[in-house]
Swiss-Prot record:
Entry's Gene Ontology cellular component terms: extracellular region
GO MF annotations, alphabetized: acetylcholine receptor inhibitor activity; ion channel regulator activity; toxin activity
Disulphide bridges, residue numbers: 24-44, 37-65, 50-54, 69-80, 81-86
Name this protein carries in UniProt: Alpha-bungarotoxin isoform V31
InterPro entries listed in its UniProt record: Snake_3FTx (IPR003571), Snake_toxin-like_sf (IPR045860), Snake_toxin_con_site (IPR018354), Toxin_cobra-type (IPR054131)
Known tissue expression: Expressed by the venom gland.
Organism per entry: Bungarus multicinctus (Many-banded krait)
The UniProt record lists the keyword Ribonucleoprotein: no
Source species taxonomy: Eukaryota, Metazoa, Chordata, Craniata, Vertebrata
Length: 95
């Protein structure tokens, strides 16, 4: 019984030591895809802002992984989250 308990403790420690990786949507690839974030980057983010084509194409959207939530500039909307695929693209931007 002690051997079984010790084995379970060791397995638990090994599994916890592997760490958790999060899956985020990213615009670094075309088309937009979901990727497993590198170790240490445990947040998904979505940045949106208007460029010169905003009135015809809509906002520019940047999606990705981050270790810390990116700093927000005055003209940007930034959201961060910490569950798999929690940063979807609000809509596909034309062309």
């Amino acid at each position: 019984m002690k051997t079984l308990l010790l084995t379970l403790v060791v397995v638990t420690i090994v599994c916890l030591d592997l760490g958790y990786t999060i899956v985020c949507h990213t615009t670094a690839t075309s088309p937009i895809s979901a990727v497993t974030c590198p170790p240490g980057e445990n947040l998904c983010y979505r940045k949106m802002w208007c460029d010169v084509f905003c009135s015809s194409r809509g906002k520019v959207v940047e999606l990705g992984c981050a270790a810390t939530c990116p700093s927000k500039k005055p003209y940007e909307e930034v959201t961060c989250c910490s569950t798999d695929k929690c940063n979807p693209h609000p809509k596909q931007r034309p062309g």
